Amino acid sequence: MEWISHLENDDDVLEIEDYKVRKDALLIAIQVTQNAINNGTLHKALEAAFDAVTDRIVISPQDYTGVMLFGASMQSEDDGDEFDDESDTHFILKLGLPTAAQIKRLKRLAEDPDLGERFKVQEEPHLMDVFFDMNRHFINMAPNFASRRIIYITDDDTPTTNEDDINKTRVRIEDLSHLKVKVEPLLINPSEDKTFDSSKFYALVFNEDTSVEPVEAIDLKQFINKRNVLNRSLFNVKMEIGEGLVVGVRGYLLYAEQKATSTTRKAWVYTGGEKPEIAKLESQAVTIESGRSVDKADLRKTFKFGNDYVPFTEEQLTQIRYFGEPIIRILGFHNSSDFSELFIHSVRSSMFLYPTDEKLVGSIRAFSALYQSLKNKDKMALAWVIVRKGAKPILALLIPSTKEIEGLHMVFLPFTDDIRQEPKTELVSAAPELVDATKNIFTRLRMPGGFESQRYPNPRLQWHYRVVRAMALQEEVPKVPEDKTTPKYRSIDTRVGDAIEEWNKVLQSSSKRPAEDICKAEKKVKSSDAGPPSNEQMQNMVENDIVGKLTVAELRAWGAANNVEPNGSKLKKDWVEVVKKYYGK
């Protein structure tokens, strides 16, 4: 198989901060039905669309977003009681970068208490025309976007029963597919008592790869949030399974820290003129001794060797950094149990590998065979990884995923140079009765479904977005940030309040030992073979004011172990004072 390159330089791979450069156009299409108006689903859909639009403006400002309503005539804001009967397709926001005025219009619509009065619902919408309008809209507004998507929201499972209309609608959806526009249907159950029946219409018009499973209206925001930002590939490289066997894979970051200070979301602005202007920052190198400006061409990167500096040219740096072309080379296979302890030693965020036939035909089939073999045999692969030209090589484990998507998690491992010495710690064991009391608390506080990351947005990041949104839309800036990670103290008290009180009683009873017992224990410590008192023993003696019973030799041994000694005189009273001061007495 031959590696087919469609790029002038396919060795260059995007850095983590730049993995969102491919532009994405997202159109949120919402069907207006009488049922959606009556049960509030239309309100929820518009609110979710508003949140998606404002979030994308801040999170991925290079992407386009649009909002479209269909299935009803709409009353214009400017025309009083007049309805637009010419079309049942209304672009509330056309694909593009929306202005503050357009976003305010969408917000007014989402918050309108008389929303139902603004629409005249059609009994049988012409969906073939709706999908045709979407097609033309993408061609006109986002012709060169690498990613184009539609989130299609409806609660009507039978828009038509006419077989000719069903066939025409299927053709229109296929036209969108040929245009590389992906349609993601969000089919909402009409009510709590009635389930959306996809078999009546939507299973007939969408291809079998498209999910037509219905969801509840309460899941609207969660569904859209998951698809709000496109998960773009970080790199596209060859994976060498064995000599002569190479497949193409893409690497994705399933988890990437979102930062409010990303370079794509901020800019410096000059406000001293008649209107604000974007400012371009430039840096200038100067010498430390004379302060003279230096051209970039005259600079050399140097590395310190003792008291000397060793300069390198760009060519020399490139040469010493080169360890081969970008590749993921499998070195061998091991049982999963052989590497069970290595997960805690990961030196960077793991990545997710998925096959692609873009440059190497047959990659998906070969990759799937590798995945199935690793999963069925409970194996992991050890790999040598260079993800981009000039990057340092690194070792990684390739672990088959256990979820629906058949891919490999790439967990990076340290070299021997990266491993630091573990700190010397003292093993402290709790009393068995205290362990049992703690288990009782943990068992009653355990989350039924486990920890779910998607339920807890970053409070600091969301607070930043809310403030920026409010200032951009000239709204009142919120005073208090929303933090969903704040413990629910009342619920905790209801569930384990009595168990916590019992735990405190057990702790006090197990930690307060009679002075006679401590003395007996310390007598054992005084034997020549026992060594210095432990920190736990010494703290107990401080609390019971019996440090003076120790000999100077024992105090010196404890001081040497803890790197502590008196200043000046080293009499026994000085050692006792140092010990008490060390433990805050």
Curated annotation (Swiss-Prot):
One of its GO terms (biological process) is telomere maintenance. One of its GO terms (cellular component) is chromosome, telomeric region. Residues 514-527 have a biased composition (Basic and acidic residues). Residues 239-444 form the Ku domain. This is ATP-dependent DNA helicase II subunit 1. It catalyses: ATP + H2O = ADP + phosphate + H(+). Residues 514-537 are annotated as: Disordered. One of its GO terms (molecular function) is telomeric DNA binding. Gene3D superfamilies: 1.10.1600.10, 2.40.290.10, Ku70, bridge and pillars, von Willebrand factor, type A domain. InterPro entries: Ku70, Ku70/Ku80_beta-barrel_dom, Ku70_bridge/pillars_dom_sf, KU70_core_dom, Ku_C, Ku_N, SPOC-like_C_dom_sf, vWFA_dom_sf. Keywords: ATP-binding, Chromosome, DNA damage, DNA recombination, DNA repair, DNA-binding, Helicase, Hydrolase, Nucleotide-binding, Nucleus, Telomere. Heterodimer of Ku70 and Ku80. It comes from Yarrowia lipolytica (strain CLIB 122 / E 150). PANTHER family: KU AUTOANTIGEN DNA HELICASE, X-RAY REPAIR CROSS-COMPLEMENTING PROTEIN 6. It is an enzyme of class 3 (hydrolase). Coiled coil: none annotated. It comes from the Eukaryota. It is found in: Nucleus; Chromosome, Telomere. Single-stranded DNA-dependent ATP-dependent helicase. Involved in non-homologous end joining (NHEJ) DNA double strand break repair. DNA-binding is sequence-independent but has a high affinity to nicks in double-stranded DNA and to the ends of duplex DNA. Binds to naturally occurring chromosomal ends, and therefore provides chromosomal end protection. Required also for telomere recombination to repair telomeric ends in the absence of telomerase. KU70, of the KU70/KU80 heterodimer, binds to the stem loop of TLC1, the RNA component of telomerase. Involved in telomere maintenance. Its EC number is 3.6.4.12. Belongs to the ku70 family.
